[in-house]
């Protein structure tokens, strides 16, 4: 059994950090958590205004007011995702943001996050392009982590069930 994780972030640079994480589980359960950038001892100050306007639509103020503490987010992810033999994400950026999140919490994940194209290549011989094409044609990504994780799961389900 496998789970899907998706992140939204403050931007797309080496200075960016996770602002929302969501997951989708085999039973159809999905969840997302906003992350409070003030709850880390790391210097999470980078903010890409264009990413806010064009991608995730979240303000830093919303994150500061409604976001969870990084330690609480990591503990929740470890509890929920630690029971799955495989946890997939759809980009290497997600791997980067997972590392940044756990570093900020001074914790380690209880699961291994694998980029989906590597898994699909090994499982079905499918290239990243197949996944991207299916993702673009079968669903609309809203850049809301929980919703997007669920959409990614639907696409992967379709690809692995295809002859």
Model segments located where?
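Acidic, Mg2+-coordinating catalytic module of metal-dependent nucleases/exonucleases
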Residues: 85-91, 97-101, 130-163
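Substrate-recognition/cap helix-loop segment adjacent to the acidic, metal-dependent catalytic center
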Residues: 93-113
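Conserved non-catalytic scaffold segment of RNase H-like nuclease domains
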Residues: 2-3, 7-95
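Short non-domain terminal segments
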Residues: 109, 117-120, 163
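Residues that form generic nucleotide/phosphate-binding pockets
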Residues: 52-55, 66, 80, 101, ...
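Active-site-proximal helix-loop-helix substrate-binding element of RNase H-like nuclease domains
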Residues: 39-42, 47-53, 60, 115-153
């Amino acid at each position: 059994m496998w789970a899907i994780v998706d992140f939204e972030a403050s931007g797309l640079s080496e200075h960016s950090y996770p602002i929302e994480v969501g997951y989708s589980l085999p039973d159809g359960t999905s969840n997302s958590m906003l992350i409070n950038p003030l709850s880390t001892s790391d210097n999470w100050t980078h903010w890409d205004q264009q990413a806010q306007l064009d991608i995730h639509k979240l303000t830093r103020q919303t994150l500061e007011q409604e976001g969870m503490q990084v330690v609480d987010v990591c503990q929740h992810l470890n509890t929920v995702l630690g029971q799955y033999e495989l946890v997939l994400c759809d980009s290497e950026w997600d791997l980067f943001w997972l590392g940044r999140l756990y570093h900020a919490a001074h914790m380690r994940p209880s699961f291994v996050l694998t980029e989906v194209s590597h898994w699909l290549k090994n499982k079905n011989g499918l290239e990243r392009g197949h996944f991207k094409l299916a993702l673009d044609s079968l669903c609309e990504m809203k850049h809301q982590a929980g919703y997007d994780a669920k959409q990614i799961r639907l696409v992967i389900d379709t690809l692995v069930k295809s002859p």
